[in-house]
Regions:
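Small-residue-rich hydrophobic transmembrane alpha-helices
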Residues: 40-100, 139-158, 264-330, 361-384
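Short runs within selected transmembrane alpha-helices of multi-pass transporters and secretion channels
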Residues: 61, 131-150, 158-166, 187-202, ...
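Transmembrane helical elements of multi-pass membrane transporters/channels
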Residues: 9-25, 131, 165, 194-198, ...
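Interfacial/gating helices of multi-pass transporter permease domains
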Residues: 32-51, 119-127, 184-185, 226-234, ...
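Residue-level hotspots within the lipid-embedded alpha helices of multi-pass solute transporters
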Residues: 18-22, 55, 95, 99, ...
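Helix-terminus/linker motif at the lipid-water interface of multi-pass membrane proteins
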Residues: 23-41, 110-119, 175-182, 243-276, ...
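N-terminal transmembrane alpha-helices
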Residues: 2-30, 34-35, 51-63, 92-99, ...
Length: 446
């Protein structure tokens, strides 16, 4: 169904988009580091909450992408467009609700999640959280539209929009932080403006009726409960999985925040830099939703396996190069962030250990996207949620508080989480039970 040229056309823009996202994330942290470690720490704490929200919205978009991909596999573009309208409606309403909660509960939520943190860190976190919350509805629109274009195998639209969004963000950061000396607000305001621009651009483009999947030109999205249920059947388990994953990271971040500013800053910078190692798997995972979803929709189970195996091999090939480069360059890269010697030492150690452990990651996080594309979302959710609470959270507290391993204990617990997921997902994949055993029309909940 997909030639290697088709796969390259889908995956290369996705990888570029992921690179852009990581580079902009790095630029944010580097620029705000000029304000001080308290600013870096405040932004890092808020980013862990924002990532939870973003992953929740992304899971809903994934549900829509799976439904649309399976309809396209069955050559049913009409229902694919109906699903697109309902996806846009659902994600926007959810994002507005989340924004209101975040704006109203600003300081209370931060205090509830992270407990007693230093006053200057809290002040920076409050400012950044407020501005981040305003951007959530725009980001939801962008994510939903990007997912729709990926389901068509057209990822160029989202990467071009992402390029525009990130350019606005970086230029805005430089102007507001270095030129206007606005501190953390100088990072937050360009985030709002850039995400608003991206959301509006994608909303204009996705209304084009010439595209295989499109939404109503006048945004008369309608209300189709059955179609929304189809999307939620995929999106809710994926959302619970992603939300629990990010909630676990927040709880771990709360644990790290008790270790002092140097540990928070070192942990934040290490997390920022190792994002490069996630790039191929994240992009390939997004591509799997399209490729495997269409194969399953068309009933081509053998091809679904074939493409999954091929994409995992590509993931490992790119990852090997990135891991070697990041390990070799870890010290000079950390030096960019203007950290204290203690924080720099922590960051370098975390990066080196992380690079070796990444051999587990593709099977733990890229492979389950193939299962989700085949609607096998309950298994991935149960496995991920159990692993998160047992290993990433539970073991982190044991290693940090019981064995006094500091932030390295958090890293070790994370690797244990990866290993458990990888074993169960690999067994599930090899068994073939992730593939639907019923007529394909049921795969999208008709």
């Amino acid at each position: 169904m997909f030639s290697k040229k088709d796969l390259r056309r889908l995956l290369i823009p996705l990888i570029i988009e992921q690179i852009l996202a990581v580079l902009v994330g790095m630029a944010d942290v580097v620029m705000v580091s000029a304000v001080g470690e308290a600013a870096v720490s405040g932004v890092s704490l808020v980013d862990s909450i924002s990532t939870l929200i973003i992953q929740l919205l992304a899971a809903l978009s994934t549900g829509g992408a799976v439904v649309c991909s399976q309809y396209l596999g069955k050559k049913d573009a009409k229902n694919a467009s109906v699903a697109a309208n309902q996806l846009l409606l659902s994600t926007f309403l959810l994002s507005v609700f989340i924004m209101i909660v975040a704006l109203v509960g600003n300081r209370s939520l931060l205090a509830l999640i992270f407990g007693s943190i230093e006053a200057d860190v809290m002040s920076n976190a409050q400012t950044y959280f407020f501005l981040s919350a305003v951007s959530y509805p725009f980001l939801a629109i962008y994510d939903a539209c990007a997912a729709l274009y990926r389901s068509m195998g057209n990822s160029k639209v989202s990467v071009n929009t992402s390029l525009c969004m990130n350019a606005i963000n970086v230029v805005g950061n430089a102007l507001c932080v270095y030129g206007l000396h606005m501190g953390v607000a100088g990072v937050g305001i360009p985030t709002v403006v850039s995400r608003a621009a991206a959301g509006i651009i994608m909303l204009v483009i996705v209304r084009n009726p010439d595209h295989l999947i499109h939404v109503d030109r006048r945004l008369r999205l309608g209300f189709h409960p059955q179609m929304i249920r189809n999307i939620l059947r995929i999106g809710v388990p994926a959302g619970m999985e992603n939300s629990m994953f990010q909630l676990g990271k927040i709880l771990v971040q709360s644990l790290v925040s008790s270790l002092g500013t140097a540990s928070i800053a070192g942990f934040a910078v290490a997390n920022n830099l190792v994002q490069f190692e996630y790039l191929p798997g994240t992009a390939i995972g997004l591509g799997m939703v399209t490729v495997i979803g269409q194969c399953v929709g068309a009933g081509e189970h053998a091809q679904a396996r074939q493409y999954t195996n091929y994409l995992l091999k590509v993931n490992y090939g790119i990852l090997a190069v990135l891991a070697v480069l990041l390990t070799a360059l870890s010290t000079p890269l950390v030096g960019i962030y203007n950290l204290s010697p203690e924080a720099s030492s922590i960051a370098v150690a975390l990066i080196v250990v992380h690079s070796f452990a990444m051999i587990i990651w593709p099977v733990a996080f890229a492979l389950p996207n193939a299962l989700r594309a085949a609607s096998d979302v309950k298994f991935t959710m149960v496995t991920a949620v159990f692993s998160m609470w047992a290993f990433r959270i539970g073991l982190s507290y044991v290693l940090v508080l019981g064995f006094h391993l500091g932030v390295m204990g958090v890293w070790i617990a994370m690797f244990a989480d990866w290993g458990f997921r990888a074993v169960l997902f690999f067994i599930r994949y090899r068994s073939g039970r992730w593939l639907p055993q019923r007529p394909q029309k049921q795969a999208v909940g008709q």
